[in-house]
Amino acid sequence: MTEPVEIFKSLGDETRLRLVNLFLQADEELCVCEMADALDLPQYQISKHLTILKSAGLLLAKRKGTWVYYSVDREESPLLRDLLKVLSRHLSQQQFAADAAKLAQRLALREDGKCVVGFILSAQTNKLRRQKSERKA
C-alpha cells in the first residue's frame, strides 16, 4: 500500500497537479507526448513528474509498441480513490480547464485509440486535426 505521505508529497507541485487533472478529465490512458503537448512543456519535464507520481503509487505505466501509456491507479487504496474524487471536484481553475481543452484536441488526433503523432507544437495540433477531419469527410 502506498503511504499517504508519499501521495501528498507527490501532489505538492503545480505541474503534477496539472498532470493528475489531465488523467481525471480524460479518464483514459495517456502517452507522454500527449501530455507534453497539452501542458506545453518539454517531454523530459513531463517524464520526470510522471516518475514521481508513479513512485507514489498514483499511476500505472504500460508499454504499447513505441509509446508508454500512463493511467491513474484507481484500485491502489481507498485513500487514493477518495483523494481522486476530491481532486476531480476542485481542479477546475482556469489553467486546469485550458489544459483539459488542449488535451481533448490532442486526443482527437489518435487513430484506433492510439497515439500516432509524437511530439508536436500547438499550431501543428490544430492543422493535423483539420486534415484528419477532411480525410473523414
Where are these regions (language model features)?
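Amphipathic alpha-helical dimerization/coiled-coil segments
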Residues: T2, P78-A137
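A structural preference for long, well-packed, hydrophobic secondary-structure segments
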Residues: E14, Q25, I52-S55, V72, ...
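A general structural signal for well-ordered secondary-structure junctions
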Residues: E14-L17, E29, L59, L109-G113
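Beta-hairpin "wing" of winged helix-turn-helix
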Residues: S55-K64, S71-D73
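Intrinsically disordered, low-complexity linker/tail regions enriched in Pro/Ser/Thr
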Residues: H49-L50, L60
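Alpha-helical residues within the helix-turn-helix
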Residues: D37, K48, K54-S55
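N-terminal helix-turn-helix DNA-binding core of bacterial DNA-binding proteins
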Residues: T2-Y44, W67-E75
